[in-house]
Swiss-Prot record:
F-type ATPases have 2 components, CF(1) - the catalytic core - and CF(0) - the membrane proton channel. CF(1) has five subunits: alpha(3), beta(3), gamma(1), delta(1), epsilon(1). CF(0) has three main subunits: a, b and c. GO terms for cellular component: plasma membrane; proton-transporting ATP synthase complex. It comes from Malacoplasma penetrans (strain HF-2). InterPro entries: ATP_synth_F1_ATPase_gsu, ATP_synth_F1_gsu. PANTHER family: ATP SYNTHASE GAMMA CHAIN, ATP SYNTHASE SUBUNIT GAMMA, MITOCHONDRIAL. It is found in: Cell membrane. CDD domains: F1-ATPase_gamma (cd12151). It is a peripheral membrane protein. Pfam families: ATP-synt. GO terms for molecular function: ATP binding; proton-transporting ATP synthase activity, rotational mechanism. This is ATP synthase gamma chain. Its main location: membrane. Keywords: ATP synthesis, Cell membrane, CF(1), Hydrogen ion transport, Ion transport, Membrane, Transport.
Length: 286
């Protein structure tokens, strides 16, 4: 049984840990609020751009839409992980979803420091062609525009690349987020549906010089927008997961402190009672 001094030391250590996890929870909450506002604001832009792109695509017969690909070809997976730890099952859920779909001849492009070691630890044999560490301050559209350009070039020039897919965390609410997959190339099936009506944004416009030229000129922007939207949404989920993990850790620490204090008080009371008994017994002996 632990002595009073040992119990005191444990309480101090756990109290120190509780302060750290609570501070991290507050930081994560602040980041979550900021990222959530960014995500909600940019979702408006994503929706309007998606509607416009779908309309232009439905009027285009660009060769990129009919590229012949090998049925035995590989898929490039653009996977989003965190660059920091202590975010609960956030990264593990992405790996589990990746394991459901990936094949050994596929290729992985990793965004986020924590992905590489986790993927290797799970025995995924696919080649990792890109391993990019990405902090919150590094999120900018220019970076994803470059990634989109490289992905499109590989897709157009390599017959054996049959598809490019994105796997990321989809935000449901602050307590719920799930791994999700969508096709970047070939274009998602929802975009394949013909659309004759113009986007309902109150503007009257025409496509000049023609739908094919406009489609090919904004395709990179569309791909970059999809990638940017996925990383922003993943960042919301990451900070929500970290906030929840730190909140749970703080509550568990406080519960441990409570239990140790009860144990400390019981042991102290027992020792005091023992001392009183010994004093009384000694007095009677005299």
């Amino acid at each position: 049984m632990a002595s009073l001094n040992e119990i005191k030391k444990r309480i101090k250590i756990i109290e120190s840990t509780s302060k750290i996890t609570n501070a991290m929870k507050l930081v994560s909450s602040a980041k979550l609020k900021k990222q959530k506002e960014l995500f909600l604001n940019e979702s408006i832009y994503y929706k309007k751009f998606y509607d416009l792109f779908t309309y232009i695509k439905s009027n285009s017969d660009s060769e990129i839409l009919s590229l012949k690909k090998s049925e035995e070809g590989k898929t490039i997976w653009l996977a989003f992980f965190s660059s920091m730890g202590l975010c609960g099952s956030f990264n593990l859920n992405i790996v589990k979803e990746l394991q459901k779909h990936i094949k050994s001849n596929d290729e992985i492009w990793l965004i986020g420091k924590k992905g590489k070691n986790l993927i290797k630890s799970k025995g995924i044999e696919a080649e990792i062609s890109l391993d990019l560490e990405l902090d919150d301050k590094d999120i900018n559209f220019d970076l994803f525009h470059i990634i989109a350009e490289n992905l499109l070039a590989k897709y157009k020039n390599d017959y054996n690349i049959k598809s490019i897919k994105v796997i990321y965390s989809k935000f449901v609410n602050s307590l719920s987020f799930t791994p999700s997959v969508f096709s970047l190339l070939p274009l998602d099936k929802a975009i394949e549906k013909p659309r004759l009506d113009k986007p309902n944004n109150g503007a009257d416009f025409s496509i000049q010089p023609n739908a094919n030229d406009v489609f090919e000129s904004i395709l990179i922007d569309y791909l970059a927008t999809c990638i940017h939207g996925a990383i922003v949404e993943s960042k919301v989920c990451e900070n929500a997961s970290r906030r929840n993990a730190m909140d749970s850790a703080t509550k568990n620490a406080n519960e441990l402190i409570k239990n140790y204090k009860l144990e400390f008080n019981r042991k102290r009371q027992s020792e005091i009672t023992q001392e009183i008994t010994e004093i009384v017994s000694g007095a009677k002996g005299e």
